[in-house]
From Swiss-Prot:
GO terms for biological process: calcium ion import; calcium ion transport; chemical synaptic transmission; membrane depolarization during atrial cardiac muscle cell action potential; membrane depolarization during AV node cell action potential; positive regulation of calcium ion transmembrane transport via high voltage-gated calcium channel; positive regulation of calcium ion transport; protein localization to plasma membrane. Its main location: membrane. It holds the Pfam family Guanylate_kin. Residues 62-81 have a biased composition (Polar residues). Residues 34-107, 186-257, 483-632 are annotated as: Disordered. Keywords: Calcium, Calcium channel, Calcium transport, Cell membrane, Ion channel, Ion transport, Membrane, Phosphoprotein, SH3 domain, Transport, Voltage-gated channel. PROSITE patterns: SH3. Residues 193-205 have a biased composition (Low complexity). Signal peptide: none annotated. This is Voltage-dependent L-type calcium channel subunit beta-2. The keyword Chaperone does not apply. The keyword Phosphoprotein applies.
């Protein structure tokens, strides 16, 4: 009985248990009935021990302990295992050191290209980053500057935000693998409870959710996909909520039938390649080609040219870049349709303009597009330009109407067309369609608002760690700043000299009344400024070659930039601008190389403008500042004269 009790007792060391058993045997009663049940044979069997000094009962009861003690030898890593682990650690540390060194070198390298993200990524759960803690997290619609490729899974770059440093960016291959893993876990989660399924999807949802969940339908990113997604998301919701349970059987089937149609939206590429510097495009307050819109944008162009001198490229774009949609350029079957349409811009010309814009952006200078055909943000939403849309807004339609009427009968004739265009812009969702909305009452306030945004964007794209000059920019600067270069002397210096002589007579007669103000200009004057901007911007060697192509154009091809039909406004443009441009060019002599010049102003126009200004100024309330965009007479702009620094004249004669 004693031995049976000891066999049930907690296991102890073999030697200690043997001594305790001998003591207990001597103290136990001799005739115990419980001990009889085992018999002497059993007791003898238990007492005779094996070679390890343990009885059979000890072996069964102490098997766990004894095996653990034996495992104290077998669980120890051998010398080969230790050396292998040390080798792995050394290799890991060396790879991490090399990755850190490559990361430091990449800080001074130029930006290879830029991408816009279509997905969201969180680096919190990543454990395979080349340098732990150096992965970059981003949201959908963010912009990334990529310096170089590290390996197949990681790029080296930075998030285009102020204060963000260089790090590791997951490559499209890695994001695609993560998306597949996420889908597999989501499918597995369907077989578990809703709680576990929700946890699995949410943990990976922070890393790479589908772009449609974080992409507003009206945003500028891949409208084709998001439009379909909005339709897909709305229809199942309507099937689920209002339908009774009896129809719940049919709604999944209808959804499954629709899924192949929407299958392409689930494979949206994680990145879209965009220009390294997002081009700035002005829209509003109404249609380009009319005086109210042109004079307001002209004032902003002049301000930007002086405010960001040496850091900005202002270029004119005559081609209809709204045709440069990704779905069109990537689908050869649609090329013939575009070519057969009555558009003045061929796809080859459009593609050339897009490449030129990308090339300008490589210098990491601010790029401003003076685009003739862009009057609405939706025109560029499907392109790869990812522009900064600046909306020059007149909040009150009555004020815009009075401004249009103040420009004379020729502008009031097309009042309805301009008001409809302004109304279309006002209906756009502001946060999703525009990056900057200039609705200030004062010209200087609007200019400072735009300047503050562009300064912040400049700091975001030029971190302190990459202050070294851009090699491409340095090369183009060295080319464009040689005043005695024969090419530049013929293209810019000589033409500017001709412009000075051509303008001397008309300017001397009206300089006293014109110089104290920023006179509103017509379309041809506005475009001449942009062409001169392109010729004199720093760091745009590609732009000079493009200017030469502009110079080779005939007058008819240039005029086509302004008489291009914009939807249903074609007859208004032809009626208004063909005689206008012919009249101005008859009064102006052209230089030998074909540069467009600034047309002389008409005094009769100015006198009528004085009267219109007096009437208009009485009717305006809080929108007094719009005078600074248009009727710049007398004291309205004279106090800005010292700050403006003769913008009009400097734009054309400054070398």
């Amino acid at each position: 009985m004693v031995q049976s009790d000891t066999s049930k007792s907690p296991p102890i060391a073999a030697v200690a248990q043997e001594s305790q058993m001998e003591l207990l045997e001597s103290a136990a009663p001799a005739g115990a009935l419980g001990a009889q049940s085992y018999g002497k044979g059993a007791r003898r069997k238990n007492r005779f021990k094996g070679s390890d000094d343990s009885t059979s009962s000890d072996t069964t009861s102490n098997s766990f302990v004894r095996q653990g003690s034996a495992d104290s030898y077998t669980s120890r890593p051998s010398d080969s295992d230790v050396s292998l682990e040390e080798d792995r650690e050394a290799v890991r540390r060396e790879a991490e050191r090399q990755a850190q060194a490559q990361l430091e070198k990449a800080k001074t390298k130029p930006v290879a290209f830029a991408v816009r993200t279509n997905v969201r990524y969180s680096a919190a759960q990543e454990d395979d980053v080349p340098v732990p803690g150096m992965a970059i997290s981003f949201e959908a619609k963010d912009f990334l500057h990529v310096k170089e490729k590290f390996n197949n899974d990681w790029w080296i770059g930075r998030l285009v935000k102020e204060g963000c440093e260089i790090g590791f960016i997951p490559s499209p291959v890695k994001l695609e693998n993560m998306r597949l893993q996420h889908e597999q876990r989501a499918k597995q989660g369907k077989f578990y409870s809703s709680k576990s399924g929700g946890n699995s999807s949410s943990s990976l949802g922070d890393i790479v959710p589908s772009s449609r969940k974080s992409t507003p339908p009206s945003s500028a990113i891949d409208i084709d996909a998001t439009g379909l997604d909005a339709e897909e998301n709305d229809i199942p919701a309507n099937h689920r909520s209002p339908k009774p349970s009896a129809n719940s059987v049919t709604s999944p089937h209808s959804k499954e039938k629709r899924m192949p149609f929407f299958k392409k939206t689930e494979h949206t590429p994680p990145y879209d390649v965009v220009p390294s510097m997002r081009p700035v495009v002005l829209v509003g307050p109404s249609l380009k080609g009319y005086e109210v819109t042109d004079m307001m944008q002209k004032a902003l162009f002049d301000f930007l040219k002086h405010r960001f001198e040496g850091r900005i490229s202002i270029t004119r774009v005559t081609a209809d870049i709204s045709l440069a949609k990704r779905s069109v350029l990537n689908n050869p079957s649609k090329h013939a349709i575009i070519e057969r349409s009555n558009t003045r811009s061929s796809l080859a010309e459009v593609q050339s303009e897009i490449e030129r814009i990308f090339e300008l952006a490589r210098t990491l200078q601010l790029v401003v597009l003076d685009a003739d055909t862009i009057n609405h943000p939706a025109q560029l939403s499907k392109t790869s330009l990812a522009p900064i849309i600046v909306y020059v807004k007149i909040s009150s339609p009555k004020v815009l109407q009075r401004l249009i009427k103040s420009r004379g009968k020729s502008q009031a004739k097309h009042l309805n067309v301009q008001m409809v265009a302004a109304d279309k812009l006002a209906q756009c969702p502001p946060q999703e369609s525009f990056d900057v909305i200039l609705d200030e009452n004062q010209l200087e306030d609007a200019c400072e608002h735009l300047a503050d945004y562009l300064e912040a964007y400049w700091k975001a794209t030029h971190p302190p760690s990459s202050n070294l000059p851009n090699p491409l920019l340095s090369r183009t600067l060295a080319t464009s700043t040689l005043p005695l270069s024969p090419t530049l002397a013929s293209n810019s210096q000589g033409s500017q000299g001709d412009q000075r002589t051509d303008r001397s007579a008309p300017r001397s007669a009206s300089q006293a009344e014109e110089e104290p103000c920023l006179e509103p200009v017509k379309k041809s004057q506005h475009r001449s400024s942009s062409a001169t901007h392109q010729n004199h911007r720093s760091g745009t060697g590609r732009g000079l070659s493009r200017q030469e192509t502009f110079d080779s154009e005939t007058q008819e091809s240039r005029d086509s930039a302004y008489v291009e039909p914009k939807e249903d406004y074609s007859h208004e443009h032809v009626d208004r601008y063909v005689p206008h441009r012919e009249h101005n060019h008859r009064e102006e002599s052209h230089s030998s190389n074909g540069h467009r010049h600034r047309e002389p102003r008409h005094r009769t126009r100015d006198m009528g403008r004085d009267q219109d200004h007096n009437e208009c100024s009485k009717q305006r309330s809080r929108h007094k500042s719009k005078d600074r965009y248009c009727d710049k007479e007398g004291e309205v702009i004279s106090k800005r004269r010292s700050e403006a620094g003769e913008w009009n004249r400097d734009v054309y004669i400054r070398q």
